[in-house]
Amino acid sequence: MTALKRIEREPLWDLAHAQLRDALLAGRFEPGTVLTLRSLADSFGTSITPVRDAVTRLVAQGVLQQGPRNSAIVPHLSRRELSDLTVVRCALEGRASREAALRRHDDATLRKLKERLSTMQSLISARKLESYLEHHRKFHFGIYAMSGIPLLVETIENMWLRCGPVLSFVIPEYVVLLKGWDHHTAALKAIMAGDADGAEREIVADISDAAHYLASLADSTGQLRRPSS
């Protein structure tokens, strides 16, 4: 079971949901993983009740599948499902990037994004990729938050939750290739220049390129599988 932080304060179900959400976004659970309420409750240091509430919410969102009694399953993702998610993600995240470019932003916000981007590039160069996906997610959502549309950001997060378990499949082969052309750098430059078309184009290209790589990992049944090392 992936290590999860113990929960010390109320409301327990909300914190359990946040922890599970963050773990899924970070790709810490492989597709097919069975999450039992008891093991999750033990990790959190809570009773089963708040964990059940959190898992029920994620099942209702389509992020997890209902498993055998008192459990849930991290779903596999098919090439077709990935294609559908990519269409939606490109539309939503492209729009968020466009809106971010059309707004004025303070120096502190832009500086944080530049620092995050620099960290991502350093991790790639050093091939220290254990924390790359976390920085990658925070970079993307840093841009989307700049759109000033919280509902849009929330909807984007729901899409990421659905594809989170396979995002780690891009480590290490695909991520290392990002040294060739960096859509992240180009997107940030476009936002800083107020180039809405450029920002949207680069974010959409980033999503599409990664999806193309992930689609190539599908097995004969169309299910995405982690590449063999």
Task: Name every feature range the model reports, one short phrase each.
Residues 11, 108-111, 175-178:
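Short helix-capping and inter-helix turn/linker motifs at the boundaries of alpha-helical repeat units
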Residues 20, 96, 100, 143-147, ...:
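Hydrophobic recognition helices of helix-based DNA-binding modules
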Residues 102, 125, 192-193:
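Alpha-helix C-terminal capping/termination sites
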